[in-house]
Design a protein with these regions (language model features):
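Active-site machinery of serine-nucleophile hydrolases
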Residues: 29-39
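Flexible "cap/lid" subdomain of the alpha/beta-hydrolase fold that forms the substrate-access gate
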Residues: 8, 22, 36, 43-77, ...
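Alpha-helical and His/Cys-centered functional microenvironments
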Residues: 17, 29, 83
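Conserved residues at beta->alpha junctions
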Residues: 13-16, 173
Length: 198
């Protein structure tokens, strides 16, 4: 998605979203900025490759997008998983970042360092998503149940997620390889930690 003219702003969505998550911000921001809201690798309408979900590689995806669009420097805004990509991008390509905004995110290395039983219970899905092939098998055909959990239990005010928005995300995750793409994002966590600690 791309709208508007002016200084470029790239919006990176979180899990379990797609660029559709920015549908309310894009019209407002595009009054003054050139707004670009891609789907992250493995999410939404992107390809669903078998590998390359570490945040350094996903940051390279954003760098390539900038190259294709002829962008020299951007304001980079990331939410949740998108914040992890944005942070990695800012570390690897600081000369390309005018401003960085990260929302709803704890740094990868902190999550890994502070993981305990209490946090594991609260963030059970982080660990569930790491198991090879099982989440995909259990979620297939039940995407609406899986997504309902996140949009009900993990949302401050679940009534803000309209039926239209929910159905949009369900359709996105029913696409071939979509659940695997999201799981691969989480499965790259150990590699992300190693990159952050280097």
């Amino acid at each position: 998605v791309e709208e508007g003219e002016g200084a470029p702003v790239i919006l990176l969505h979180g899990f379990p979203e797609t660029n559709y998550a920015w549908r309310y911000q894009i019209p407002v921001l595009s009054r003054h900025y050139r707004v670009i809201a891609p789907d992250l690798r493995g999410y939404g309408e992107t390809d669903k490759p078998a590998s390359g979900y570490d945040k350094r590689n996903m940051a390279r995806d954003i760098r390539e997008l900038m190259r294709v669009l002829g962008l020299q420097k951007v304001v980079l805004v990331g939410h949740d998983r998108g914040a992890r990509v944005a942070t990695r991008f800012a570390k690897d390509y600081p000369e390309l970042v005018d401003r960085l905004v990260v929302m709803d995110n704890v740094p990868t290395r902190i999550v890994a360092r502070d993981l305990n039983a209490s946090i594991a219970r609260a963030y059970w899905f982080f660990l569930f998503h790491l198991v090879p092939d099982l989440p995909e098998a259990l979620i297939a055909g039940r995407e609406h149940i899986w997504l309902r959990h996140f949009f009900s239990d993990w949302t401050y005010n679940p009534s803000t997620i309209s039926d239209e928005a929910f159905d949009t995300y369900v359709r996105a995750y029913q696409a071939p390889g979509a659940v695997r793409g999201a799981m691969a994002d989480y499965r790259a966590n150990a590699e992300d930690v190693a990159q952050d600690m280097a």
